[in-house]
């Protein structure tokens, strides 16, 4: 995935997955 949330509009489901992954790393 070369684009981020700023470059592409993600659906809520995808955003939730990204947030979950970020929380895990944090």
UniProtKB/Swiss-Prot annotation:
GO terms for biological process: proline catabolic process to glutamate. Keywords: DNA-binding, FAD, Flavoprotein, Multifunctional enzyme, NAD, Oxidoreductase, Proline metabolism, Repressor, Transcription, Transcription regulation. Residues 1-26 are annotated as: Disordered. Its cofactor is FAD. The keyword Flavoprotein applies. Pathway: Amino-acid degradation; L-proline degradation into L-glutamate; L-glutamate from L-proline: step 1/2; Amino-acid degradation; L-proline degradation into L-glutamate; L-glutamate from L-proline: step 2/2. The keyword Transcription applies. Residues 9-26 have a biased composition (Basic and acidic residues). This is Bifunctional protein PutA.
